[in-house]
Amino acid sequence: MTDFSASPDLQDPTTHAGFVAIVGKPNVGKSTLLNAFLGTKVAPTSPRPQTTRRGVRGIYTLDNRQLIFVDTPGLHKPKDALGKYMNSEVHSALSDVDAVVWVVDLRHPPTDEDRLVANSVRDLPKPLFLVGNKTDAAKYPEEAMKLYGALLEGRGSDLPVSETMLSAQNSVNAVATLREQLLEVLPENPFFFPQGAASDQSREMWAAEIIREEAMKKLRDELPYAVATRVNRWTEREDGLQRIEGEIIVEKNAHKGMVIGAGGKQLREIGQAARKQLEVFLNHKVYLGLEVIVIPGWREDEEALRELGYE
């Protein structure tokens, strides 16, 4: 079972440890890259933009060095209070980290959202790593990479940019090489987390994100973006069965019916898919109970956002 404990454990001061922000516009593969860095799944992934809503921290420890990756939401032009919160997570991460990984989608030239990211990272006095993703599906990946690099022109000569292009053929080796480069730029610090910790998330938050990931895969149109999830109860029986009780939160009664589906079919499919993921990572049988509840306009309600963990 993945260890999600994260109580601080200060170690020998000769160790090196630091934080690395993974940034980029929505849906460029930031969470997938985080999971690849760690070799385990701590962040939800889906083909839909804005799957990541809060800064998820993943921890990689090797010998006397510890990397704490911060997977940030996609930087975008917000439409509601939730979107503003997500952008604030990005800017907060950038202010506190020791290095930055900027992930870009080489299938397309830079967009206004990419320029937002470039403007946020260009002048940071921190090591910057530009990662070109989705190379296999790009017609002209090298040309696209040059366009993204050009957005960083004006960065001082004392602030070099390291570039990496990921493809299906080189993904494993390229990720390992990039991780080694990040390990080398860590400042001298005591460890921030105990060895063996994979994330600072509680197990309840991690499970809630798995449920939301599967909901986003199943639901259509704009509905996935009006969905939140939480786990209210988690108990373990003597035989190892994990009993998890969760909620899917929507904004309207009409949305509730869409999530449940005819005869409960949609909700069952979401629950079954989430349960299978949980069983793989927990290495235990899981009973997952899901209820759909309505919190009107929760994305614009700051109190509701806080209750759902967006604070």
Curated annotation (Swiss-Prot):
UniProt-listed SUPFAM superfamilies: P-loop containing nucleoside triphosphate hydrolases, Prokaryotic type KH domain (KH-domain type II)
Chain spans, region G2: 50-54
Annotated spans, G5: 166-168
Membrane topology: Peripheral membrane protein
Annotated Era-type G domain residues: 16-188
Stretches for region G1: 24-31
Residues annotated as domain KH type-2: 219-296
Residues annotated to bind GTP: 24-31, 71-75, 133-136
Keyword rRNA-binding: yes
UniProt superkingdom: Bacteria
Keywords: Cell membrane, Cytoplasm, GTP-binding, Membrane, Nucleotide-binding, Ribosome biogenesis, RNA-binding, rRNA-binding
UniProt-annotated stretches for the region G4: 133-136
GO cellular component, one term: plasma membrane
Annotated function: An essential GTPase that binds both GDP and GTP, with rapid nucleotide exchange. Plays a role in 16S rRNA processing and 30S ribosomal subunit biogenesis and possibly also in cell cycle regulation and energy metabolism.
Name the UniProt record assigns to this protein: GTPase Era
Organism in which the protein naturally occurs: Deinococcus radiodurans (strain ATCC 13939 / DSM 20539 / JCM 16871 / CCUG 27074 / LMG 4051 / NBRC 15346 / NCIMB 9279 / VKM B-1422 / R1)
Gene: era
